[in-house]
């Protein structure tokens, strides 16, 4: 597709809007590179992907892409043997978490709707759970490693806490005993060592090592000799901690290196998902639909809206071309919306051919054009004025060099900017040349000569943008089949021009011209009504055919389901009878064995009686098996819509969807079929003991699976508060005493939002920022009520 048309039709503005819905820079770059695809298969494939994304957003909500970030730098560093920073490891962990969550997101039950395009993409994802868990366990934030990263690190930090506590106790004692020599009754730190702020005149009174001096020279910072060994031990522990952290980071970096290719493959798929769902979110914002893409060069856009005009201001239009006519001539006054109309056609085609859904009504179609050419103004926005004749003509000459039968050409004010007679003649000649090449054309003009050309030329149709004479404003509604009028006399009259001047002006126009205008208007208005009714009739007929086909399919499924249910019931009955007959045969066989062993004649007669009685019983059982099923269970007396019941005749559970009628019948839903049955034939459903136990077990399992921390990094404030609120409810129900909310340090906006939420939360007893080793300012520790 030529760059000039993409620019003139403002496709770049569409891409800027889509970028706002993408999470990653990589997905935004894909949006920036978006342009019409050059083959029909790829167009339909991309449209289906975007449509599936829209349906998922409506039915399941946003996909779990939180925490997704670019990890290329970290992976490259790991592959070269380098050690990744905690921040780089966090990004890898976030990507792996998004991988696993997306994989889970696309798992579905058989009864759920399938999304084959996106499910195939999700199938490629390969979670690395072990590495994800290790990173999550080890890394708290971009500048802190968790105590849980290793037992060695945990022991070192425990020792550090103990040593620091001992030093603080000792130095507090020294402060008290030497307070008269100190500037303040406080100790401070220089480097990693505890020191006292000693007045310069008393520095000899406090034996120790001088570490620093104030800028005025009035204070010396002295480490008391009694603390030197303790400070040395603390220093050694800090060095051990640093070495252990380096080892942990190095070990994790090596594992990232081993899984580097898998990580990059997952990232590529996740970025593609980010790109697709950005298009889906934009489609949702536009209330857009998936268009049909036609190969024959024809299109029908119903209630098409320009996507860059605000919803409350845009006027939908029906625009069609390619079946009854190949060229559309839109006439009427300036500022009437003609330019908006042709820009809408061009932009909606570019969007659809780029795999984007379009703001229009269902069943709208676009054509598969190889090229779309546009001569609209001086590459200006919709609101700006037209360019000069020479600028127009330079562009038109270039267009005419490249147009063929796979092209759509859009001309705004064709032939304008020069003598009207010459301009109209040029316009007709240009249109005829391009029509002979088989191109589809839409042109706007206010020349009467072009209205007449459209009226008498096969394959060319007039159209206009409606104008309200009362308000002197265009309605922007496109009327295909109705030529536009300049409305100069009517507008002048409404603006106060005296009647005599208007009457004299009409006299200067030939009677033929006046009659011509009125006759055209009258004929075309009748024509538009007839064509509109014909199109609506065709649409209704097509819809009726679709409905008929759908209901025939449903009826077939219903019959198949009913037949299957009947066959299942018969098979079950036959199995019961067969088992009973086998049991009877075993009994009779045993009787014969006893008879052989010498049972008396009277006994034999009794055996025969029992045998006959058993046979009669089996026959009765076979006849009445259906009756037995019906008599099982408790009858239903009180009916509520949506209640579950058991239908013995189908041997399955059903849902009651109507109240009893005067015949005592209710409608029930059994799978995909609905049937009317007598209320007396239904039975209450019984929840088995096993089901009750299973349900209780599921509740207990759900509560026992609540973790003691929740990670909100990567979410915005609203999403984070929602997730934290739900997590606190679950944690409270699971009787967790204290939990950790991880929000990261960042700008502090997320932390403040969480704190505001915690102040009002009914389950929260108290909360505080994390201490050293817990996550510091990057986490909030929450104590829950008992």
UniProtKB/Swiss-Prot annotation:
Alphabetical list of SUPFAM superfamilies matching this protein: DNA repair protein MutS, domain III, P-loop containing nucleoside triphosphate hydrolases, SMR domain-like
Q: Any idea what job this protein has? A: Endonuclease that is involved in the suppression of homologous recombination and thus may have a key role in the control of bacterial genetic diversity. Acts as a ribosome collision sensor, splitting the ribosome into its 2 subunits. Detects stalled/collided 70S ribosomes which it binds and splits by an ATP-hydrolysis driven conformational change. Acts upstream of the ribosome quality control system (RQC), a ribosome-associated complex that mediates the extraction of incompletely synthesized nascent chains from stalled ribosomes and their subsequent degradation. Probably generates substrates for RQC.
- Stated EC number for the protein is 3.1.-.-, 3.6.4.-
Question: What SMART domains does this protein's entry cite?
Answer: MUTSac (SM00534), MUTSd (SM00533), SMR (SM00463)
A Pfam family that the UniProt record links to this protein: MutS_V
What does the entry give for GO biological process?
Answer: mismatch repair; negative regulation of DNA recombination; rescue of stalled ribosome
Subunit-level organization: Homodimer. Binds to stalled ribosomes, contacting rRNA.
User: What residues does the Smr domain cover?
Assistant: 710-785
This protein's UniProt keywords: ATP-binding, DNA-binding, Endonuclease, Hydrolase, Nuclease, Nucleotide-binding, RNA-binding, rRNA-binding
User: What Gene3D superfamilies is this protein classified in?
Assistant: 3.30.1370.110, P-loop containing nucleotide triphosphate hydrolases
Q: What is this protein called?
A: Endonuclease MutS2
Q: Which family does it belong to?
A: Belongs to the DNA mismatch repair MutS family. MutS2 subfamily.
Instruction: Cite the GO molecular-function annotations of the record.
Output: ATP binding; ATP hydrolysis activity; ATP-dependent DNA damage sensor activity; endonuclease activity; mismatched DNA binding; ribosomal large subunit binding; rRNA binding
> Where does this protein hold ATP?
332-339
């Amino acid at each position: 597709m030529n760059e000039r048309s993409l620019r003139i039709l403002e496709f770049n503005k569409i891409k800027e809007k889509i970028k706002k819905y993408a999470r990653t820079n990589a997905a935004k770059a894909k949006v920036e590179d978006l342009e019409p695809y050059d083959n029909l298969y790829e167009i339909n494939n991309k449209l289906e992907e975007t449509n599936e994304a829209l349906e998922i957003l409506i039915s399941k909500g946003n996909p779990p892409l939180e925490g997704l970030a670019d990890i290329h730098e970290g992976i490259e560093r790991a592959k070269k043997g380098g050690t990744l920073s905690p921040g780089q490891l966090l990004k890898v962990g976030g990507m792996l978490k998004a991988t696993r969550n997306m994989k889970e997101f696309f798992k579905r039950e058989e009864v759920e709707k399938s999304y084959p395009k996106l499910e195939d993409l999700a199938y490629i994802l390969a979670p690395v759970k072990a590495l994800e868990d290790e990173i999550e366990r080890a890394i708290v934030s971009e500048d802190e490693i968790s105590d849980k990263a290793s037992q060695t690190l945990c022991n070192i930090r425990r020792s550090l806490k103990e040593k620091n506590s001992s030093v603080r106790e000792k130095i507090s004692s020294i402060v008290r005993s030497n307070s008269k020599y100190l500037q303040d009754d406080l100790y401070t730190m220089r480097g990693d060592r505890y020191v006292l702020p000693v007045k310069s005149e008393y520095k000899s009174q406090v034996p120790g090592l001088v570490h620093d001096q104030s800028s005025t020279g009035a204070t010396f910072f002295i480490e008391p000799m009694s603390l030197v060994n303790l400070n040395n031990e603390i220093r050694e522990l800090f060095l051990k901690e640093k070495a252990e952290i380096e080892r942990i980071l190095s070990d994790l970096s090596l594992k990232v290196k081993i899984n580097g290719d898998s990580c990059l493959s997952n990232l590529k798929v996740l970025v593609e998902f980010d790109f697709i769902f950005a298009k889906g979110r934009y489609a949702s914002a536009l209330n857009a639909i998936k268009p049909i893409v036609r190969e024959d060069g024809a299109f029908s856009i119903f209630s098409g809206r320009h996507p860059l005009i605000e919803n409350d201001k845009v006027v939908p239009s029906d625009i069609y071309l390619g079946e009854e006519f190949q060229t559309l001539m839109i006439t009427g006054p300036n500022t009437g919306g003609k330019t908006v109309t042709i820009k809408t056609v061009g932009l909606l085609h570019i969007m659809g051919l780029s795999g984007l859904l379009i703001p229009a009504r269902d069943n709208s179609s676009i054509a598969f054009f190889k090229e779309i050419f546009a001569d609209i103004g001086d590459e200006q926005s919709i609101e700006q004025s037209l360019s000069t004749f020479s600028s127009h003509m330079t562009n038109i000459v270039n267009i005419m060099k490249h147009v063929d039968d796979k092209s759509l050409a859009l001309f705004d004010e064709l032939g304008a900017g020069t003598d009207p007679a010459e301009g109209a003649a040029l316009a007709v000649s240009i249109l005829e040349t391009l029509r002979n090449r088989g191109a589809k054309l839409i042109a706007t003009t206010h020349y009467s000569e072009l209205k007449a050309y459209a009226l008498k030329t096969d394959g060319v149709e007039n159209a206009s943008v409606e104008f309200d004479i009362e308000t002197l404003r265009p309605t922007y509604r496109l009327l295909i089949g109705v030529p536009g009028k300049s409305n100069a006399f009517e507008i002048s009259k409404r603006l106060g021009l005296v009647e005599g001047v208007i009457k004299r002006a009409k006299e200067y126009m030939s009677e033929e011209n006046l009659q011509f205008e009125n006759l055209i208007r009258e004929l075309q208005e009748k024509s538009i009504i007839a064509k509109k009714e014909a199109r609506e009739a065709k649409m209704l007929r097509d819809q009726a055919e679709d409905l008929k086909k759908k209901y025939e399919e449903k009826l077939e499924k219903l019959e198949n389901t009913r037949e299957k249910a009947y066959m299942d019931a018969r098979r079950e009955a036959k199995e019961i009878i067969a088992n009973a007959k086998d049991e009877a045969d075993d009994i009779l066989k045993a009787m014969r064995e006893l008879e052989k062993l010498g049972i008396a004649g009277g006994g034999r007669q009794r055996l025969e009686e029992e045998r006959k009685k058993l046979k009669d019983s089996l026959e009765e059982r076979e006849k009445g098996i259906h009756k037995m099923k019906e008599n099982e269970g408790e009858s239903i007396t009180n009916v509520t819509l949506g209640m579950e019941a058991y239908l013995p005749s189908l041997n399955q559970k059903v849902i009651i969807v109507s109240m009893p009628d005067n015949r005592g019948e209710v409608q029930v839903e059994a799978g995909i079929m609905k049937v009317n049955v007598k209320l007396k034939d239904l039975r209450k459903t019984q929840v088995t003991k096993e089901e009750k136990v299973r349900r209780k077990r599921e509740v207990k399992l759900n509560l026992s699976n609540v973790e003691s921390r929740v990670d909100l990094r990567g979410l915005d404030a609203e999403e984070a508060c929602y997730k934290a609120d739900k997590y606190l409810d679950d944690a409270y129900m699971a009787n967790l005493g204290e939990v950790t909310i991880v929000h990261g340090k960042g700008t502090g906006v997320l932390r403040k939002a969480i704190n505001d939420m915690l102040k009002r939360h009914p389950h929260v007893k108290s909360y505080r920022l994390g201490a050293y080793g817990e996550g510091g300012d990057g986490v909030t520790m929450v104590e829950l009520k008992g």
